[in-house]
Swiss-Prot record:
Record-stated family: Belongs to the formate--tetrahydrofolate ligase family.
Domain of life the protein comes from: Bacteria
UniProt protein name: Formate--tetrahydrofolate ligase
Catalytic activity from the UniProt record: (6S)-5,6,7,8-tetrahydrofolate + formate + ATP = (6R)-10-formyltetrahydrofolate + ADP + phosphate
SUPFAM superfamilies: P-loop containing nucleoside triphosphate hydrolases (SSF52540)
Protein source organism: Staphylococcus aureus (strain JH9)
Amino acid sequence: MTHLSDLDIANQSTLQPIKDIAASVGISEDALEPYGHYKAKIDINKITPRENKGKVVLVTAMSPTPAGEGKSTVTVGLADAFHELNKNVMVALREPALGPTFGIKGGATGGGYAQVLPMEDINLHFNGDFHAITTANNALSAFIDNHIHQGNELGIDQRRIEWKRVLDMNDRALRHVNVGLGGPTNGVPREDGFNITVASEIMAILCLSRSIKDLKDKISRITIGYTRDRKPVTVADLKVQGALAMILKDAIKPNLVQSIEGTPALVHGGPFANIAHGCNSILATETARDLADIVVTEAGFGSDLGAEKFMDIKAREAGFDLAAVVVVATIRALKMHGGVAKDNLKEENVEAVKAGIVNLERHVNNIKKFGVEPVVAINAFIHDTDAEVEYVKSWAKENNVRIALTEVWEKGGKGGVDLANEVLEVIDQPNSFKPLYELELPLEQKIEKIVTEIYGGSKVTFSSKAQKQLKQFKENGWDNYPVCMAKTQYSFSDDQTLLGAPSGFEITIRELEAKTGAGFIVALTGAIMTMPGLPKKPAALNMDVTDDGHAIGLF
């Protein structure tokens, strides 16, 4: 049986005018800034806050296969299912990054009949937010180099500049570069490097800001480097926070689009969860809470990454609670964690599902540690067998875990009604949502708490560089920030080949980065990179554009 591609399904779908989508949740035309017929930005100053804000449902996942487990698909499909049940609902997602789109993912707007549209636009340049973030980031680099070239009044040590340039592309050749070469007229030579745009602190700040004033304040607190006597230098010292905020004045506004079934969707911000905090913007989530009774959102990768950061960074900063958490599981991921090779994942193997269930079990238990009852969604794939699915259901029943088979890829919202009903039961019950740790704990103890309680590790080892940074950060007054772990998404450990639910392992913190503007400390583990590379056969090889301007190969 031949199935339509995600792009084919998207192209065959009928879009409603964006003003009609806006009107369905009470957004006035005065608050709408259209970008064509089917997408718009929202002027949040013209949205009336409501006292009884919508309840937030977070979608996370078990540790994924390289292809992903359909978390965005389930997020959109669950929102469509609530829509099917006549609930007042919105979905809030991150924006896709071009690097992974051309690399391995091929797009990130959901899949099948559970997508947000217009799919081509969202996956490519959308409303220009990533370009604005890239420009603001690189403008700061230019201001830093110009300051040094023009006499270096602040005494910046060019050997200790922490700020890097960024590009919205996977490009390993740019990880380490030299700038300022070619003689005195071209600036002061120094080592530099590029991160991918989604790892930029500007991206994190945009996603954690509540207003333009908040954006400007956070930008002013960015630590760009140090003086020769190791004193931090901030954007406020350079006096360019106003200029950088001006570049972002439109990017900070949430983007409104729609699902295939007409569910209103806010797609805004896009930090990765393995190298950044992995959540869409607070502004988008809060705007949705002012407009809808239920807000379905997602956080990148598994409970060990995006979900943990959602609870300990985003929800803490925004000041809202979670009503429910959905953990997406797939039969293929369970088999992978049960020891099955990638090429054999389509073959029935109930024993491997049994062996791999420990990974899902740990993710479920992780959510419980935050005081919220999880609901498991088995995201159905065509190669799943009844025996494999029934084993997972029986495991859930034995362990008193809520579960639903979810067929939103094939059936849209109708395929998610069982899941929606399970989530509604959880939403109606009180919970004791809380972060994992208190901010007053020392940085090393916060890291140890994440590693031992969420990852299942036994010990954290800090490199000599990280130990010096811990001491320096404490002296600088940065000890009370939350922690943002940078770690492989494929394993609970820092070794991506260690699958299942390993325990007793050590995690090494090789380096720390102070994101004093965003307000968290990044702890880099293992071989994690903040500028990815492309695979041997990138998804770009299958992409093209027709003579009449339609994309081919986005999936």
